[in-house]
Swiss-Prot record:
UniProt-recorded name of the protein: Nascent polypeptide-associated complex protein
One GO BP: protein transport
Matches recorded under InterPro entries: NAC-like_UBA, NAC_A/B_dom_sf, NAC_arc, Nas_poly-pep-assoc_cplx_dom, UBA-like_sf
Xref: CDD domains: NAC_NACA, UBA_AeNAC
Name of the coding gene: nac
Amino acid sequence: MFPGMGGVGGRGMNPAKMKQMMKQMGIDVKELKDVEEVVIKTADSNIVIENANVTIMTVQGSETYQIVGDVKEVPKSLEIPAEDIKLVMEQTGVSEEEARNALKNSNGDLAEAIVALSSA
């Protein structure tokens, strides 16, 4: 084990000592406050991280971002077939616009869209 790290009895290192060691090694860590969501855009989809906790670690001038939160992947162009819209409209009795929105919100999942509209 590493000296001063604790390890015995489930005790960790003293936070002040850890901060001092990190400073000596040229490492700065800070939390980005009030982050609502983080979006990572790729060619095929957007990765949306909601309720995000973002930590920035700076080591020798390079920044590394650590993001923790609720991850959701959203396809960039979700084509909703007319038959799917019609089916949702027939099953739930809603307008075309409401059916289209429900399908978009469910990433094209018919059952999820119908359940969401039926329970609303």
